[in-house]
Amino acid sequence: MTKRRGSGEDSIYKDGERWRGAIHLGYDDKGRRVRKKVSGRTRAEVAEKLRKLRKLVDAGTVPDDKITVKAFLDRWLAHSLPGTVAESTEDDYNDTVRLHLAPALGRKKLAKLTVLDVDKLWQAKRDAGYSANSIRIMRTVLRKALTQGEREGILPRNVAALSAAPHVVAKEGRTLTIDQAKALLDTVAGHRFDVAIMLALAYGLRRGEVLGLHWAAVDWDAGTVRLTHSVKRIKDRDKASGRKTRLVVGELKTPKSRRTLVLTPQLVAKLRTLHTRQAKAKIAAGELWQDHGLVFASEIGTPMDPDNFSHIFSKLAKRAGLGHWHPHELRHSGASLMLAQGTPLHVVSEILGHTSIAITKDVYGHLLVDDKRAAAEAMSGALFGA
């Protein structure tokens, strides 16, 4: 074995038919020398690899040639992700890794994962019939995980962030007409969830947001209510409980989603009536009542299961002659009706809790055609005459 060292290089030597090189990284906690090794067919190839490796080390990045993508993702899910996102989102990320990322990329070495590898995965998912939005979620999860690798200094770049992002076409859901909305409200009048449905329709609220409303968030004098929480059903990680899922009342994730709604006098009056009705239900329930401070609770005060609420709403919609509807369609309906009444797009965006007005525009921008036409006609009249 012959050992040679060139000017400005780390150690390079020939081992049989191949050339090998090593770079000194320092010492471990036991005082042992730590080196990073590379190999190639020619001395020049090894020298170039060492040069690139030295550049990464000088920048604070030390690639780990041993860890696989799956091992890294598992470590990220177990140690880095918890506490940074909602529990339901954490469950979704675990499922995305288990079902999509680990099977396709898991056996690859993390340091050798390329943009092409990731792009090929997205294409394979498209060929398998997955929607652009589903692939976008997969890309988001991988990008966030690899960002942790960058922070740790074991990745020089984020290949997921550099991969081709799928184009997602936002689609507007089915919406109620004014007449249908009135028919629904007439049908639900007097029902225990009439105010919940009114709020969901008037402000385009998600069902979890409606069910997460707290009495403490209602300002009776100002006539406002603050959205701060949402009710969701998530996986139960406590194996001793024997349950697969559990209900949680969690804080809304983003600053834009935590928002204040201005109530009409009619809605304030409806809420007062509901408050009185709930006080009577509390007395009737006696010791069974569990006070969570929720505006829309079960008959014993506990959080209402969103799926049960959906079932109740669907039955009421059918009773109103509308057929099968889902509560989320009240959100689309509320947004569409607000825009139809001339509410400015940025106001609708704030009421819906979108993170940016661009999202609102992508989903509901086509409803503004009449506004654009009116603006064009006004400008034409001002500039060119009637």
State what each model feature region is.
Residues G40-V57:
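A short, charged, amphipathic alpha-helix used as a generic interaction element across diverse proteins
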Residues A132-T140, R151-W215, W220-D221, K232, ...:
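Basic, Lys/Arg- and aromatic-enriched nucleic-acid-binding interface segment
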Residues M1-S39, S88, T228-D236, A240:
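Short, Arg/Lys-rich segments that mark the N-terminal edge of DNA/RNA- and chromatin-recognition modules
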Residues A160-L162, A222-S230, H326, L337, ...:
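Short functional hotspots where side chains directly engage DNA or cofactors
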Residues R4, A128, A132, K182-F193, ...:
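Short, basic (Lys/Arg/His-rich) helix/loop patches that form interaction surfaces
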Residues V38-T42, V62-K66, K70, D74-V159, ...:
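N-terminal core-binding DNA-recognition domain of tyrosine site-specific recombinases/integrases
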Residues R35-S39, T175, T224, R258-T260:
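Well-ordered beta-strand positions in beta-sheet-rich domains
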Residues M1-K3, V62, D186, A222, ...:
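C-terminal secondary-structure termini that scaffold catalytic or DNA-interacting sites
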